[in-house]
Amino acid sequence: MESQQLSNYPHISHGSACASVTSKEVHTNQDPLDVSASKIQEYDKASTKANSQQTTTPASSAVPENPHHASPQPASVPPPQNGPYPQQCMMTQNQANPSGWSFYGHPSMIPYTPYQMSPMYFPPGPQSQFPQYPSSVGTPLSTPSPESGNTFTDSSSADSDMTSTKKYVRPPPMLTSPNDFPNWVKTYIKFLQNSNLGGIIPTVNGKPVRPITDDELTFLYNAFQIFAPSQFLPTWVKDILSVDYTDIMKILSKSIEKMQSDTQEANDIVTLANLQYNGSTPADAFETKVTNIIDRLNNNGIHINNKVACQLIMRGLSGEYKFLRYTRHRHLNMTVAELFLDIHAIYEEQQGSRNSKPNYRRNPSDEKNDSRSYTNTTKPKVIARNPQKTNNSKSKTARAHNVSTSNNSPSTDNDSISKSTTEPIQLNNKHDLHLRPETY
């Protein structure tokens, strides 16, 4: 009879049967409050998890609060979705705390899909499709970038006023050492530029091109927090974050200043290695140039000792300064100041010798007068005349003139002339010399 009634009302009899069977099975002398500590911890964890998911369990007045009593479990409600992005990828309030940086130790906790633009630059909607990517985020700097052929699928939601490149943007690698931060921040800046955020990057004067919005600042902070773990940050970055843990713009500004300083250091090293001096410029200017370079390098942590500095300076000396390489090469403890004392001594000696030379500059008017009366005497022609050939070189007119005069002269003169050729010539001098015609 009782079984017939149960068969007529299967849903009621099933519940009654379950309740009766359950009550018989749990009917023991054990105190329901006597529960082990491990089970209490499990209950606490379950309740905490339920509170975090913001799910409520409806209270049932029909079922007593007995942990051993079987009661129907409520259906699990899936967490709400925020557009195309999964809920587990969104940052919570606890994770926004700086102490929660450890939650982002793995790339899968990134608050946006890897290799894509910031979520704020894509219109939300069910049409957007974001493919899954392998766990290659956080790879070293040498890892090749994704292939350029990987692009988003075309969608009707792409026609929007918002900016979209429809290309995967590779995020920066994971920072693994404080010494790698200068190289890492370069990839981080490149990542921001590829994400259409180049306008908010500080310029040389430390100010961005355009103001930054709150959403963009949140994106900067999240990306920096994920890929730059706090234990691998340099000391100066930790000092900035200790004042304001969201001041990523100040970190970028300081990083750009350090990049420019590194460029200046490289230029100073190249200049110091290629020094040249031959006395054409003042020694004071050369000394000031070299000492300023050495001081800048020492202040930036690149120490140049006296031995290395002297070798670099002496290698660039030429001319009269070249011998300093050989006179000073045995002095191991020579300083840069001592080397420049020798350079100054040679330079002053050169200047003194140039000033002591006489200056023979003539008046231009004198040069003009001399040019008028000057004859060409560069190579005067010296002619040696032979007396025997002199008489033979007379012209015919001179000979004819002599003949005519001899015919017109009296005979007495001719006789005296003929006699003078045979008689010796008497010289009235103290030596009493006689010249004969044959010896003349």
UniProtKB/Swiss-Prot annotation:
**GO cellular-component term (any):** cytoplasm
Region span, RNA-binding: 299-401
Q: Where in the cell is it found?
A: Cytoplasm
One GO BP: viral translational frameshifting
Polar residues compositional bias, start-end: 1-10, 48-60, 127-152, 419-428
One Pfam family it belongs to: TYA
- Ranges annotated as biased composition (Basic and acidic residues): 429-440
Instruction: State where it is primarily located.
Output: cytoplasm
Sorted UniProt keywords: Cytoplasm, Phosphoprotein, RNA-binding, Transposable element
InterPro entries associated with the record: TYA
Q: What does this protein do?
A: Capsid protein (CA) is the structural component of the virus-like particle (VLP), forming the shell that encapsulates the retrotransposons dimeric RNA genome. The particles are assembled from trimer-clustered units and there are holes in the capsid shells that allow for the diffusion of macromolecules. CA also has nucleocapsid-like chaperone activity, promoting primer tRNA(i)-Met annealing to the multipartite primer-binding site (PBS), dimerization of Ty1 RNA and initiation of reverse transcription.
Q: How does it associate, per the subunit comment? A: Homotrimer.
Q: What else is known?
A: Retrotransposons are mobile genetic entities that are able to replicate via an RNA intermediate and a reverse transcription step. In contrast to retroviruses, retrotransposons are non-infectious, lack an envelope and remain intracellular. Ty1 retrotransposons belong to the copia elements (pseudoviridae).
Protein name in the entry: Transposon Ty1-BR Gag polyprotein
Which organism is the protein's source? Answer: Saccharomyces cerevisiae (strain ATCC 204508 / S288c)
Q: Recall the taxonomic lineage recorded for the source organism.
A: Eukaryota, Fungi, Dikarya, Ascomycota, Saccharomycotina
Task: From the UniProt record, report the name of the gene that encodes this protein.
Answer: TY1A-BR
